[in-house]
From Swiss-Prot:
Annotated protein name in UniProt: Large ribosomal subunit protein bL27
Keywords: Ribonucleoprotein, Ribosomal protein
InterPro entries: Ribosomal_bL27
Organism expressing this protein natively: Nitratidesulfovibrio vulgaris (strain ATCC 29579 / DSM 644 / CCUG 34227 / NCIMB 8303 / VKM B-1760 / Hildenborough)
Region (Disordered): 1-22
GO molecular function (one): structural constituent of ribosome
Membership in a protein family: Belongs to the bacterial ribosomal protein bL27 family.
Any one of the GO BP annotations: translation
PANTHER family: LARGE RIBOSOMAL SUBUNIT PROTEIN BL27M, RIBOSOMAL PROTEIN L27
Gene Ontology cellular-component annotations: cytosolic large ribosomal subunit
Pfam families in the record: Ribosomal_L27 (PF01016)
């Protein structure tokens, strides 16, 4: 009788869920107060006018309005800031 031994099992085969970070509202979009603008790790983007920051660095709109991104310089480093222009 022919026999086939069991194949080896791989030790990989697992992966963690993505954390759904990134920009949720882009420049020029209308947002409502409380809408999440960006989910991020650390301050890749800084909060500007009418934008709040949560404990986990999430940026959110404080008022209804239009999203506007702006680049600015601090200590010879170009950073990004997000504002909400109230409607």
């Amino acid at each position: 009788m022919a026999h086939k031994k069991a194949g080896g099992s791989s030790r990989n085969g697992r992966d963690s869920q993505g954390q759904r970070r990134g920009v949720k509202r882009f420049g020029g979009q209308l947002v409502l107060a409380g809408n999440i603008l960006i989910r991020q790790l650390g301050t890749k983007v800084h909060p500007g006018e009418n934008v709040g920051m949560g404990r986990d660095y999430t940026l959110f709109a404080k008022v209804d309005g239009t999203v506007r991104y702006e680049k600015f310089t601090r200590k010879r480093k170009v950073l990004t800031r997000v504002h909400i222009d109230a409607v």
